[in-house]
């Protein structure tokens, strides 16, 4: 039974192979005529059925409309491969997670705690101010200086490494450079700054304050110029401050900053009391101790708000203690705050806003939820795992953001180029923060990287936006707080609650009130969806084919069939041509068999083998006739088994 089925299957494939070897059995012309006569597409049938003139007309129309179909198909395929998206927008109100709120004091350290550390640095800055400041006491706006600081003792360890200089550009081709801390230059009788014959404008145009940045043991130096002495001093002060505090342990720096109970005086959320204990501490390189409300870290439950308005949001009273500000560090007295997602790192310096002391600041929040399509529709990243940059902010258990990626990328370049890490960013594994003792050339290297356009563009190209992101749009309004009639009792109560003092220790210069709440419409969802898909592509391809030529999928199959048949015939013809060519190459030059040796010998001795030039006709020798049979049947008999007939 099984052997019989195998035999039948073998015979079936044998016959199929024979049919393939023989081909369709038609010529090209016969195939085209058959296709035009049997296809369901409109147009080709008219080419073979109509008269000569109409044949030409229908042939041209068929070619034109076929070209239009292929052109439209090309446009549709290109549109599909462009992976376009459609954007939908929805606005409304619903119960939502309240954003995480990070608050900082713009002054990172209490001056009373760090004054011993900064004594020498502050004296240096005061001396520099005396030597570059201007006075408008006279009509000529002459420069005045403080003689009491003429004999001040300057610590060379602080200023020799990165000195402040004044560049005299009276002769642009040959500028003169003076060290601000050099007493012999600035207090000589003929020093340039004591010249009172020039006014303030000419002085500002002539003299520029700069930082001198040197590498390779002071053999290669550049000057970082500033348009204002204030900018130069503050930049230089920040740099020196970072060098000083790089040797201070983090725990000590935290103790030198503002405690949560000192900064956050009162707290209400949704009408329910809260306190500084509901805030999570985080240390910021620029602002010191910062505190985050509703961060959602370490399994903490996040808080939600179900109603709009200030009564259902967060209310805070902050005290920034302006009398504890470092005099040469911060020129702005305010609180710095930022609204961000839960479990995301707050980049307060770059994305935060200020809250002014002596005011009540109300912030109405609208949540923008952005949802982008993944690759290939966009270059966004889902969680940052496909970004070739190590996220240094993972130690805070925070989610991916483009800000964290850019800073991690810059820190990697810093470690690679300068051989040390910058103190403002997290420390990569196997590296150390920059110090003057171990890395004497790190400051010029840092400024070179910071000013490098190529480094910024490289990091921007590596870092991608997250596919799902949330932004908080804020409408901010302010009013004086407290009012003149209420400030006395409010300050008494706040002072007592802060340090149990009956004396007023809180004043308008440091007090801030914040109201953060949802607007009437608290969310706006902007989401992307694919503008084209396979269903869209197939329907449009079929629509164009049906509109221009009245065809369908079966017509495409018919067209594919004739193409396969034509290719089949072409292959068979090519194989036959190759086979015939091989046979011609293998065919002998002479049709008769070659003569034997004896025949060749006899040809030289027997003249009968010589060529006869005359027209001699040899008589035919009569042959033997064939035998007589009653019948002669010559037929090709092909044995056919009974199974095959069945």
UniProtKB/Swiss-Prot annotation:
Residues 1-57, 573-646 are cytoplasmic. One of its GO terms (molecular function) is ligand-gated sodium channel activity. Residues 79-551 are extracellular. Its main location: membrane. The keyword Disulfide bond applies. It is a multi-pass membrane protein. Originally identified and characterized by its inhibition by the diuretic drug amiloride. It is found in: Apical cell membrane; Cytoplasmic vesicle membrane. Keywords: Cell membrane, Cytoplasmic vesicle, Disulfide bond, Ion channel, Ion transport, Membrane, Sodium, Sodium channel, Sodium transport, Transmembrane, Transmembrane helix, Transport. PROSITE patterns: ASC (PS01206). The chain crosses the membrane at residues 58-78, 552-572. One of its GO terms (biological process) is sodium ion transmembrane transport. Residues 586-646 are annotated as: Disordered. Belongs to the amiloride-sensitive sodium channel (TC 1.A.6) family. SCNN1B subfamily. Component of the heterotrimeric epithelial sodium channel (ENaC) composed of an alpha/SCNN1A, a beta/SCNN1B and a gamma/SCNN1G subunit. This is Epithelial sodium channel subunit beta-2. It comes from Xenopus laevis. The gene is scnn1b-b.
């Amino acid at each position: 039974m099984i052997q019989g089925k195998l035999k039948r299957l073998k015979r079936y494939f044998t016959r199929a192979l024979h049919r393939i070897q023989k081909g369709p059995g038609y010529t090209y012309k016969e195939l085209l005529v058959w296709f035009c006569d049997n296809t369901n597409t409109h147009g080709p049938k008219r080419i073979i059925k109509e008269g000569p003139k109409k044949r030409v007309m229908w042939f041209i129309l068929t070619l034109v409309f076929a070209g239009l179909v292929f052109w439209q198909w090309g446009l549709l395929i290109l549109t599909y491969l462009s992976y376009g998206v459609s954007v939908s927008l929805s606005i409304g109100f619903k119960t939502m997670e309240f954003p995480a709120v990070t608050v900082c004091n713009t002054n990172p350290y209490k001056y009373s705690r760090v004054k011993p550390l900064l004594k020498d640095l502050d004296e240096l800055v005061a001396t520099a101010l005396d030597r570059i400041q201007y006075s408008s006491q006279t009509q000529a706006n002459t420069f005045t200086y403080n003689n009491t600081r003429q004999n001040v003792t300057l610590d060379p360890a602080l200023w020799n490494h990165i000195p402040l200089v004044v560049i005299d550009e009276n002769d642009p081709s040959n500028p003169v450079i003076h060290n601000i801390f050099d007493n012999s230059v600035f207090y000589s009788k003929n020093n340039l700054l004591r010249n009172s014959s020039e006014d303030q404008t000419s002085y500002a145009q002539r003299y520029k304050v700069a930082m001198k940045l040197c590498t390779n043991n002071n053999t290669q130096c550049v000057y970082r110029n500033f348009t204002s002495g204030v900018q130069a001093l503050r930049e230089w002060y920040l740099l020196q401050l970072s060098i000083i505090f790089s040797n201070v342990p983090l725990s000590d720096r935290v103790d030198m900053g503002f405690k949560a109970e000192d900064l956050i005086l009162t707290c209400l959320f949704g009408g329910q009391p809260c306190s500084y204990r509901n805030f999570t501490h985080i240390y910021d390189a620029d602002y010191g101790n910062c505190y985050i409300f509703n961060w959602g870290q370490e399994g903490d439950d996040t808080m939600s708000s179900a109603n709009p308005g200030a009564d259902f949001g967060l209310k805070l009273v902050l005290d920034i203690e302006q009398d504890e500000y470092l005099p040469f560090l911060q020129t702005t007295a305010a609180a710095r705050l930022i609204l961000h997602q839960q479990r995301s790192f707050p980049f307060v310096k770059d994305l935060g806003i200020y809250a002014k002391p002596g005011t009540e600041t109300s912030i109405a929040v609208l949540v923008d939820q952005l949802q982008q399509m993944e690759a290939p529709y966009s270059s966004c990243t889902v969680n940052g795992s496909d970004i070739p940059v190590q996220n240094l902010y993972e130690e805070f258990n925070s989610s991916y953001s483009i800000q964290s990626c850019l800073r991690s990328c810059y820190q990697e370049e810093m470690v690679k180029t300068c051989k040390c890490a910058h103190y403002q960013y997290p420390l990569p594994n196997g590296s150390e923060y920059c110090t003057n003792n171990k890395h004497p050339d790190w400051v010029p290297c840092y400024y070179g990287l910071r000013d490098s356009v190529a480094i910024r563009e490289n990091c921007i190209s590596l870092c991608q936006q997250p596919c799902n992101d949330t932004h908080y749009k804020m409408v901010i309004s302010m009013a004086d707080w407290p009012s003149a009639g209420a400030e006395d009792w409010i300050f008494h109560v706040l002072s007592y609650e802060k340090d149990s003092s009956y004396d007023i220790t809180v004043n308008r210069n440091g007090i801030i009130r914040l109201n953060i709440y949802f607007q009437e419409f608290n969310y706006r969802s902007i989401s992307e969806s694919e503008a084209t898909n396979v269903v869209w592509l197939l329907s449009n391809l079929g629509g164009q084919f049906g509109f221009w030529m009245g065809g369908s999928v079966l017509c495409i199959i018919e067209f594919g069939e004739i193409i396969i048949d034509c290719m089949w015939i072409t292959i068979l013809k090519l194989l036959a041509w190759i086979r015939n060519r091989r046979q011609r190459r293998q065919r002998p030059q002479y049709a008769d068999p070659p003569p034997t040796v004896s025949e060749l010998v006899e040809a030289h001795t027997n003249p009968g083998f010589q060529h006869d030039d005359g027209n001699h006709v040899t008589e035919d020798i009569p042959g033997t006739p064939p035998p007589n049979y009653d019948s002669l049947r010559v037929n090709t008999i092909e044995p056919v088994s009974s199974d095959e007939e069945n």
